Amino acid sequence: EDFVRGQKVLINESNEFRPGSISKLPVGILTIRDLDSGARKLTDTFAVQNSLKHSRADAIGRLPPGSKVQIKQYLEELFRVSNNSAQYHLRVMQGGTQVLNSRTLAELGVGSFSEDPHVSAPNSVGKVFGDIYRGKVFSPTWRNYFYDTLGSAVGSLKDAIPAGIPKGVRVVNKVGFLFGGKENTYSDAATVFANNTDY
């Protein structure tokens, strides 16, 4: 979608797919909405639990159980390195999958965008990205926080859409990939801040 001109190109937009780590976006976005409303603060903490560690090797997984981790660190790990342990802790902090799915539908207006069931559709992800751009999801301050945090993801998470964009053009993206078994998928969703328009 060309956000400035209002033009769209839609191909298989309603075809559901397994989004991989793109499914981290709802819990991150809804947590930022809580920060935006004042319901939570970046300095609020949630204790590390062994049962919520995806790996003992990541930054959250290396911490002993009971460690008080700030929401700020969970969000940075979630967006910058796509940390699964951060996702699992934020999910439980938010009340679990059913709560998140209900809020995703009620607050973001999409039903096909979740970790469990692990399914999404291009038009759902696109709607959320478009609504964030248009200021319907966050206040300007927290929209900038979202763009800055997700936009600072490590280089290995910028091998899809950003790789095809000219240098100097800002791209804020979230990749999702599933390798092994019956699944081999690599997906990406992005907002591109171009010279004459934004997408």
Feature locations, PLM:
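Active-site-adjacent loops and short helices of periplasmic peptidoglycan-processing enzymes
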Residues: E1-E115
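Penicillin-recognizing serine hydrolase domain
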Residues: E1-R5, L63-P65, I71-L75, A86-Y199
